[in-house]
Design a protein with these regions (language model features):
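Conserved Class I SAM-dependent methyltransferase catalytic core
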Residues: 1-57
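S-adenosyl-L-methionine-dependent DNA methyltransferase catalytic core
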Residues: 25-29, 36, 50-192
Length: 192
């Protein structure tokens, strides 16, 4: 038996041809009974992350079904640390650059993922209502957007509200928690 996992768009890549090649190789050339499904990890961890899972068995398994996932996940606020080093707070230059980038894309009619609001400045944050913050920052009572491999390049995908201070990015431990890693998991690299 085997289990393969990949991005959900594997099914549609190259108009579905990539998936067909993989499926046919596993089914017809290697003689596996194949089952696949797109599953959102957001039902078990506090992160929206849709992935395709492909399982294969050497014997026929007509009754195989992927398990139904029950919404029993923590929310984002459950995995956030109480005390966070200042190095995770966005510097004014980074925060302003993100907003300029967003404004440029908004003017072109493109989306830009870190915000749903118009451009704001650090000074604006001080007067925001809780409702305004809820629309702008990651919802601590919900789940996070998909955490990409390039998160630490700019930290713009998931921003954590810090009241009157600039927002912050997630710590490596918080990222591990979002992906379901246990507390005993050792993070082998620096976060620089």
């Amino acid at each position: 038996a085997f289990l393969l996992e990949n991005v959900k768009n594997l099914k549609s890549h190259d108009k579905g041809n990539t998936f067909k090649v993989i499926y046919n190789a596993l089914k017809n050339e290697l003689d596996y009974d194949i089952h696949y499904d797109v599953i959102d990890a957001g039902k078990v961890v506090p992160q929206h992350r849709e992935r395709i899972f492909i399982v294969g068995f050497k014997e026929d398994t007509p009754d195989f079904k992927f398990p139904e996932l029950v919404d029993k996940r923590p929310v984002l606020g459950d995995v956030l640390e109480d005390e966070v080093d200042e190095k995770y707070t966005l510097k004014d230059g980074t925060w302003n650059a993100l907003q300029r980038h967003r404004a440029k894309h908004k003017a072109k009619g493109n989306g830009f993922g870190y915000s749903k609001n118009d451009k704001v400045t650090s000074a604006d944050l001080k007067s925001w209502t809780p409702e305004q913050k809820k629309r702008f920052f990651a919802d601590k009572k919900g789940i996070a957007k998909t955490l990409s491999a390039r998160y630490y390049k700019d930290g713009a995908e998931i921003l954590i509200d810090q009241g009157k201070k600039n927002p912050r990015r997630l710590t490596p431990r918080e990222c591990a928690r979002i992906m379901g890693f246990p507390e005993k998991f050792k993070i082998p690299v620096s976060d620089n």
